[in-house]
Amino acid sequence: MSEPLIDLTRISAVVFDTDGVVTDTARGHAAAWKHVFDEFLRGRSAPFDIRDDYLRHVDGRPRLDGIRTFLASRGITLPEGAADDEPGAPTVHGLGLAKDLGFMAQVDKYGVAAFPATVALLHALRQRGARTAAVSASLHGGKLVNSAGVSHLFDVLIDGNDAALMNLPGRPDPALFLEAARRLDRTPPQVAVVDAALPGVRAARDGGFGLVVGVVGEGGDPAELRAHGAGVVVPDLSEIGVRGRVLPLTS
């Protein structure tokens, strides 16, 4: 089988999802979600499954969308509440605030690391003239990239703060990826997207991007990534090669 490749004679920029692709945060997110949902679900429904429920309903989505999607899968509807709700209150915002506090407490205590294979791929791409972007649905996406010490490897960084300011819908809508391509001054067919979450892979497919790379996270299913639109599926970005180089733009 030939090596999976990013061909820089065809692709001139690469957009990376932050959580689970650039930063090793998926376990922390899943654990924070489980703690919050299990507290809420006690006496209402079965506990949150840290693999299946996380991957199917929450991973890759904006926080509040993830809450709505997961609770809908259990036949539960909550009032929206407001951004000043008490963390853990039985509202969409209340659960979201509790999850946010729990996750960021872990980050503040333990820090966050970047995946070495992703860092190596970023260096290879940039040495060959490709532009790069990091995209996150999280309000803390920028902080996570900075904490991992890799912000210098990206020309563009978009997170949940940008989405809120611009009123951009979350994945599986491709709006965040399309905004990244716009800021990179590239059209979608010139851009590859690397994502580990099913909504992100679907968003890249629906956005018409030139290459969609799915990374199989812990408990992930390669077949599902392909079904959602990944043209290349790998367990680790060390398996992705880079061919050619991006030629300088000429007037």
What role is predicted for each listed range?
Residues 22, 119-120, 197-200, 215-224:
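Short glycine/proline-centered loop/turn elements that form peptide/ligand docking sites
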Residues 117-128:
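Catalytic-core regions built around general acid/base machinery
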Residues 5-6, 240-250:
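Short amphipathic alpha-helix with an adjacent loop that forms part of the alpha/beta core around
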